[in-house]
A protein has these predicted regions:
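Short alpha-helical segment of the dimerization/phosphotransfer core of two-component systems
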Residues: 11-16
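Conserved catalytic submotifs in the C-terminal HATPase_c
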Residues: 37-40, 60-72
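A conserved beta-strand-to-alpha-helix junction within the catalytic ATP-binding
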Residues: 37-52
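A residue-level detector for a conserved hydrophobic packing site
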Residues: 80-84, 112
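Short helix-loop "hinge" at the ATP-lid/N-box region of the Bergerat-fold HATPase_c
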Residues: 91-92
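Short conserved segment of the HATPase_c
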Residues: 123-137
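Conserved glycine-rich
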Residues: 164-165
Length: 186
């Protein structure tokens, strides 16, 4: 029908807009023209905000949080929020409806960890090394028609590394994935 065609065009236009925004973000990062506006904040506040938004947008998943308060970092709050949101968005994409997505904040002596864990499809061991590469999408994710450009995790990596942080990833096929952002404390 005409309405279905219009809806498909709208959806594709939105996808193209998102792709252009992601490419511009990475281009600014490559050219080192993006400024970080660091401030001190509790990572728990950002996680609570993201999970609250996701619970409204996506009632089909069960979101759980485990927040270790006073987990202060010095970072660009908007960029940090974007990185965490990318991980939560991926968990939503690859976790069956009705399943749980856990987001934790843990404090160590010199770091704060943000852990996003799901019961999703998991990532094959041979593909783990590539998940942060630009445009990379695993065979499983390409087969699922979940959409996406393969740029989200490369953007998250750029943000985290620019703040002196790094990632740890643990994943098993058909069991789920745990991605941890480890940020230095302020």
């Amino acid at each position: 029908t005409l309405q279905e065609s219009i809806d498909a065009i709208k959806s594709e236009t939105e996808s193209m807009k998102d792709l252009v925004e992601q490419l511009l973000f990475l281009a600014r990062g490559d050219n080192e023209t993006m400024q970080l506006h660091k401030q001190d904040f509790d990572a728990c506040d950002v996680v609570e905000e993201i999970v609250g938004e996701m619970e409204m947008i996506d009632p089909s998943h069960n979101f759980e949080t485990d927040l270790n308060r006073d987990a202060y970092i010095s970072a660009d709050k908007q960029l940090f929020k974007q990185a965490v949101r990318i991980l939560v968005d991926n968990s939503i994409k690859y976790t069956p409806q009705g399943e749980q997505i856990m987001v934790k904040v843990a404090k160590e002596e010199n770091s704060v960890s943000i852990i996003v864990q799901d019961n999703g499809i998991g990532i094959a061991p041979e593909e783990l090394a590539n998940i942060f590469e630009r445009f990379y999408r695993s065979d499983e994710s390409r087969a699922r028609k979940t959409g996406g450009s393969g740029l989200g995790l490369s953007i998250a990596r750029w943000i985290v590394e620019r703040h002196g942080g790094y990632f740890e990833v643990l994943s098993r096929l058909d069991i789920g994935t745990r991605i941890i952002i480890i940020m230095p404390t302020k």
